[in-house]
Design a protein with these regions (language model features):
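Membrane-anchoring alpha-helices and their flanking helix-loop junctions
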Residues: 1-91, 100-175
């Protein structure tokens, strides 16, 4: 029963994520500001923006490789498949990469579109994801996998989340 519910949930997640991406891309296109003349700043914005988008694709692909479908689709919310947490690949570089650096794509598109509205929406979406991490994901991980997850790793994650919030805020204010 739980497995069937999880499979149905995966379909819903894919639909929501797909429509979320499509809506965000349409929003970006609607707010894109083409430069009047192409200069060095424009080149830098495009190169950094495309680099952030490519980094995001790599980060999410590597996270899926490490996690697999079970963890990618929050399988342990539905049924317990006793496994230890895996800290490999991107997880060795960034704690919770889906929440900390997983929004590089949004910021990259914000730079490419040269739109303050896109940057602000990207920032707000990122902050909502970090709130989900703090209030849903982390308590769930501690409940399922125990307090061995706590300690140094949690302190590092808290610092990274705070730095991610500060970096996002800085990008939003500066742009």
């Amino acid at each position: 029963m739980e497995f069937n519910a999880w499979v149905a949930y995966r379909v819903i997640v894919d639909l929501v994520l797909g429509t979320d991406l499509a809506a965000y891309l349409v929003f970006c296109l609607a707010h894109m500001e083409a430069p009047e003349s192409f200069g060095l700043l424009d080149l830098v914005l495009y190169v950094v923006g495309v680099s952030l988008c490519l980094f995001n694709i790599w980060a999410k692909s590597d996270a899926h490789r490490v996690l697999g479908d079970y963890a990618w689709y929050w399988g342990d919310f539905f049924f317990l498949f006793k496994k230890d947490l895996t800290f490999d690949g991107i997880f060795q570089m960034f704690p919770h990469p889906m929440y900390t650096v997983g929004y590089a794509f949004y910021y990259g598109l914000g730079l490419i579109t040269r739109s303050k509205q896109v940057i602000v929406v990207s920032f707000c979406a990122h902050m909502l994801q970090l709130l989900f991490l703090v209030f849903v994901e982390n308590p769930h991980i501690e409940k399922i996998y125990g307090t061995a997850f706590s300690g140094e790793k949690e302190q590092l994650e808290t610092k990274m989340v705070e730095k991610g919030m500060l970096l996002s805020l800085f990008v939003c204010i500066e742009y």
